[in-house]
Amino acid sequence: IFNVFVFLEISSLSTYVLVAQGAKKDKRALKAAFNYLIMGTIGATFFVIGIGFLYMATGTLNMADLAERIADQRDNRTVQAAFAFIVVGMGLKAAIYPLHLWLPNAYTFAPSPVAAFLSGTATKMAIYVLLRFMFTVFQPEFLEHIGLLEMVILPFAIIAMFASSISAFLQRDLKRMLAHSSVAQLGY
């Protein structure tokens, strides 16, 4: 699991720099890159805290071993807290509604190829990690047991679909529209 964290951070560092490259045309790209850096760091911190909680509860960082040991600990508050920290951390990195506030400026002020790269890879990588943890480490039975889908993900997904679609519709800047549309698509 720790290797996943290192991979995410190395790839994130490069995207922060790429967003800042837009400063040649507009100095606001530096602020957008800084906000992206801060939000990405907060997300990474949440993710690492979740990994720490998992290690504390199970004594391993191997995904297969974690899945095996977590299956017996569905009611363990440490495991549930670890799951919450991992979801919030990856939610920030993936710009899932309502944790998406850094995304519109990062898309808008980054150079166009960078915005296209971000929309196609950087945020989707965090979604992959989140889904990998949900279905490989925690297992669907754990998700069903804690009621995450009905109580948290479904309401936010519905709000994201409508609120972000309306926000995208009201935008005049194409890249900002793409950012809001990306958040709405994550809701689907």
What function would you assign to each model-found segment?
Residues 13:
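Active-site-proximal acidic secondary-structure segment that organizes catalysis
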